[in-house]
């Protein structure tokens, strides 16, 4: 099962009573897996990693062996392979694809409804009937327009300071829209 894992800046995570160091390309094994208790934790919905590691590093992983799900967002597995490190922008794009591929599923609380803002160099994913977002310089905004629960249009824009300006709101077509200004 392909999943996503967040880490601190050193590609390490807290695990049990200590910190566990990971390396891309490596496979790790545990005897058992139970969410919030044992095993290696990851998530199916990409942006869920932000709940635990907002300013960390992110990887695509393969959850192997015994897999235990907590019924919410977490997965624990007895074996995990760290496949590839991804950027914050790639994480946002993967989240958009995940929502498009799973229209019937509830999506993460990390996804904003209708309006959102990203900090400088950050990301925001906004989904709604008329989504709009703003961001600080270097941020990337992801907008998903939906109709009857299906995504009908999408746009991603880098707040570069020239074509897309910090603090201005944009719609799914990349046009400036009126909305209260960012603080």
Give the label of every model feature segment.
Residues 1-183:
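Short, glycine-biased loop/turn motifs at secondary-structure junctions and
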């Amino acid at each position: 099962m392909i999943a996503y894992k967040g880490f601190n800046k050193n590609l390490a995570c807290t695990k049990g009573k200590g910190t566990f160091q990971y390396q891309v390309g490596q496979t790790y094994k545990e005897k058992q897996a139970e969410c919030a208790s044992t095993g290696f934790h990851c998530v199916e919905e990409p942006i869920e990693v932000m709940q635990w590691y907002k300013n960390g590093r992110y990887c695509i992983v393969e959850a192997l062996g015994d897999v235990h799900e907590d019924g919410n967002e977490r997965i624990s597995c007895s074996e995990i392979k760290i496949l590839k490190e991804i950027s914050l922008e790639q994480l946002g794009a993967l989240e958009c694809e995940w929502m498009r591929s799973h229209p019937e599923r509830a999506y993460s609380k990390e996804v904003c409804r209708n309006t959102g803002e990203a900090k400088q160099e950050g990301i925001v994913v906004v989904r709604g009937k008329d989504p709009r977002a703003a961001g600080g310089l270097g941020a990337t905004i992801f907008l998903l327009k939906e109709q009857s629960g299906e995504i009908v249009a999408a746009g991603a824009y880098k707040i570069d300071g020239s074509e897309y300006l910090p603090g201005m709101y944009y719609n799914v077509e990349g046009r400036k829209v009126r909305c209260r200004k960012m603080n």
